[in-house]
Curated annotation (Swiss-Prot):
Protein name: Small ribosomal subunit protein uS9
Keyword Ribonucleoprotein: yes
UniProt keyword annotations, A-Z: Ribonucleoprotein, Ribosomal protein
NCBIfam families reported in the protein's UniProt record: PRK00474.1 (NF001749), uS9_arch (TIGR03627)
Compositionally biased residues, Basic residues: 118-134
This protein's GO CC annotations: cytosolic small ribosomal subunit
Gene designation per UniProt: rps9
């Protein structure tokens, strides 16, 4: 039995996906992907599945997401899902389709929040006093 493990990251959220042969069940934190709320997050999560088409019907994918907020978790899960589908099938045409549609389905967004600097640490990383010339 073929098993594939993939990881997707976004900000502080980390999603780990495990893909194996099955009946096409996709679960996020043990919940079926269809009942994930709110709907706009569900729509973003369904993009790789819709683009892949019938290929997904023979794959069971379990995704576990930790850390971050709701949108960061959605992006991390989406990346892990896309990577799992491509790696399990080994289909380069599907990989090109994902990259052409949206690069973040396969490649994690490397941007992270900037650490706050000393002295004005509660106000943000680049906070300065406003300067008056007159």
């Amino acid at each position: 039995m073929k098993v594939v493990h993939t990881v997707g990251k976004r900000k502080t959220a980390i999603a780990r996906a495990t893909a194996k042969e099955g009946k096409g069940r996709i679960r996020i934190n043990k919940k079926p992907i269809e009942i994930v709320e709110p709907k706009y997050i569900n729509a973003k999560l369904m993009e790789p599945i819709i683009l892949a088409g019938d290929v997904v019907d023979g794959i069971d994918i379990d995704i576990t997401v930790n850390g971050g907020g709701i949108v960061g978790q959605m992006d991390a899960a989406r990346t892990a899902l896309g990577k799992a589908i491509v790696e399990f099938t080994g289909d380069m045409e599907l990989k090109d389709r994902f990259v052409h549609y949206d690069r973040t389905i396969l490649i994690s967004d490397a941007r992270r929040t900037e650490p706050h600097k000393p002295s004005k640490s509660t106000k943000g990383p680049r906070a300065k006093r406003q300067k008056s010339y007159r």
